Amino acid sequence: FLAAQIAANAQKMDINVAYFDSESAIDPAFLERAGCDLERLMYIQAESVEFVLETIEELLGTGHKWLFVWDSLALTPSNGDVAGDFNPLSSMAEKARILSKGMSKLTVPIANAEATFLVLNQLKTNITRSPSEAMTTPYVTPGGKAMHYAYSLRIWLTGRKAKASFINDENGFRIGSEVKVKLEK
């Protein structure tokens, strides 16, 4: 809901919004409830990491102000993932290498265009053989460290599991949850 509200506020400031959806899960009614104008929102199916980065590069060339929302990095495959087999070792670190190259190429053009790139990602459990590493770094984010070096602000949102943490509207529709927020640069 936070990303949808950010998109709605960007539209109110006459900023173009490109929404990359890799999960095919965004509901237009949900976006409208958040305040988005669907007529002015550019919805793009995120076919691959390369496709998202190339499309952003192309849109930056239009000279318009942009908010790019990528939902989500974790579930967007690389071209190699799509073309390859199911063996995870065959494409190990491929997404991280593509992101590293893409972010080094796009960081300055994004800044010069006064654009914003909002990347949604997910926390995954750090599966490691080292107990000390598992305790100090219990979670990792997909895509390697490339985004760690590229972001100007990282917002960690972790939810509470209790039903009491749910926020409902006047009709009983769940519109959110209480979360813990950690800001990081």
Which functions belong to the PLM regions below?
Residues 1-7:
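Motif I (Walker A/P-loop) of helicase-class P-loop NTPases
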Residues 5, 13-101, 105:
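Conserved inter-motif catalytic segment of the P-loop NTP-binding fold
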Residues 10:
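Carboxylate/His-rich catalytic cores and anion/metal-binding grooves
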Residues 92-185:
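Phosphate-binding/switch region of NTP-binding enzymes
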